[in-house]
Amino acid sequence: MQTLNRRDFPGRSHPDKIIQFGEGNFLRAFVDWQIDLLNEHTDLNAGIVVIRPIDTDFPPSLSTQDGLYTAVIRGLNEQGEAVRESRLIRSVNREINIYRQFDEYLALARDPNIRFMFSNTTEAGIAWNEADQFSDAPPSSFPAKLTRLLFERFEHFSGAADKGWVLLPCELIDYNGEALRELVLRYASHWQLPAAFTQWLTENNTFCSTLVDRIVTGYPRDEVAALQAELGYQDSFLDTAEYFYLFVIQGPKELAQELRLDKLDLNVRIVDDIKPYKERKVAILNGAHTALVPVAYLSGLDTVGQTMDDVQISSFVEKTITEEIVPVLDLPEDELLSFSQAVLSRFRNPFIQHQLLSIALNGMTKFRTRILPQLLTYQQQQGKLPPRLTFALAALIAFYRGERDGQTYPLQDDAHWLERYSTLWNGVKHGDIKLAELVNTVLSDTAHWGQDLTAVPQLANQVTEQLQTIIDSGMRAAVAAYS
C-alpha cells in the first residue's frame, strides 16, 4: 500500500503564507482543515509551515508525508443524519523542527508572503520564562520564540508597516491574543530591543483573541486498518474529529475579507468581544455535560451517547438547557437556541464514546465555574431557584458517595473534597449527622464557592429535599419530576 506523498498523490500546492506553532491533532483537524477548504473554494491560496515548538522527534514529522494527511470528519449534521467525510488535507507544506532547523525557522521571518500565525501550544504554552535569552537558538517558551521571529522580520524589512502579521493563538485561555501580545512586549523589554520594534509590534501587528470549539478525537487506532483499506493508502497522520466546529475571532472586520471568509460559508465569526461566546460555550456545552453526568451515571448509564438515547435523561438535559440556562445568557435567543441544538447533536454523535466517569473529573470545580453562575442569575432574575440546576447539584453531592447499585466507582477530584465527602457520607451512613447538615457543610464552603451558598434563599432546603428523594427513591424515580 502506498504512503502519502506529493509525487504519488499530486494536487493543489500553495505558497507559504501561514506559520503554525503546534503539529498536534487539534490544529490539523481545525485550522488546517478550514484553510484547506478555503484554498479549494476561494483564492486564499495559503500554504502552512508547521513549527514543532518542543524538542522531540515523536511523533515523526509531517514532512515524511510531504505535509499530506487525511482528516476524517464524522457526526450528526444539521438534519440529524450521521455523516462521515474523509478529506485529503493539502494546506500544510512542511514541518520545521525549531531545535534542529533554527536557521530555516528564522528564514520564515524574511519571507514577504507570510501573513498569518496560528498556534496551539496548550494552556501552559502562553507563559513567561525568565531564563529565555535573545541569543538562545531557540529560546524555550513559545512567546519568546515568537518574539525572536518577529524581531527578525522587523529588522529584515526595516520596520515596514505592511509587513506585520495577524496572530491568532488558539490556546484555551481567556483572551489568548491579549495574553500573547503582553508576553511578546515583555520579552521585547526584557531583551532591551529597540523602542522602534515595540512601536512596530503594537501598531503593525494584530493579536486576535480566539475561541475554538471542536472535539478532535485524533488518530483512530482501532480503525486504522479499515480506514486505510478504504482510502487506498497508508497515512500515519490520520486525524478524526466531530462534524461540529466553531471558530470565534475577536479582531478587525477586514479580517473576513483577508481570510476570504466572505467567499465561503464557514462557521467562523469575527466579533468585537469573544466573552459572550465563551460564556455560551461554558454554560451550554460544558454546563450541560456537568449537569448530566451524576444524573445519568446514577441512573445506570455510562456514556454521553447512552444518555441521549435514554428518553427520560435526554429530556432532563434538553429542559435544563432550554428552560434554565439559555434564558439567563446575554446573546440573541435564536443564536443560543441554535447553539443548543448543535450541542445536543454533538452529544448524540454515534462516532464518539464519551465516558461519563472521565467527564466527572473535578466535578466540584466544574459545577462552580459552569453551572453556579447560571443558577444564581436565574434566582436573581426570576425570584426563584431553577429546579433542574439545583437537582444537578443534589445529584452531584449524591455522586460523591461513590456507590452505584451497591458497587463502588472511582472518584477523581482534589483531596480536600474526596476526604470531606468520605467523612460526611460516613457520618450520614452511621447516623452521626443528618442529610441537611451534609448539604449545609458543602454549600457553606466559601473557599470553594467564593461565597456562602447557604445564604441563597431556599437553596439549602431545596437541595436537601432533592437529595433526600434521590437517596430514598433512587435517581430514576427522583429525576422523573424534572423530565
From Swiss-Prot:
Gene Ontology CC annotation, any one: cytosol
Keyword entries, A-Z: NAD, Oxidoreductase
NAD recorded as keyword: yes
Domain of life of the organism encoding this protein: Bacteria
Binding-site residues for NAD(+), renumbered to this chain: I18, I19, Q20, F21, G22, E23, G24, N25, F26, L27, R28, A29
EC number: 1.1.1.58
Pfam families found in the cross-reference section: Mannitol_dh, Mannitol_dh_C
Catalytically driven reaction(s): D-altronate + NAD(+) = keto-D-tagaturonate + NADH + H(+)
Enzyme class: oxidoreductase
InterPro entries: 6-PGluconate_DH-like_C_sf (IPR008927), 6PGD_dom2 (IPR013328), Altronate_OxRdtase (IPR023668), Mannitol_DH_C (IPR013118), Mannitol_DH_N (IPR013131), NAD(P)-bd_dom_sf (IPR036291)
Record family assignment: Belongs to the mannitol dehydrogenase family. UxaB subfamily.
Protein's name in the database: Altronate oxidoreductase
Species: Yersinia enterocolitica serotype O:8 / biotype 1B (strain NCTC 13174 / 8081)
Name of the gene this protein is made from: uxaB
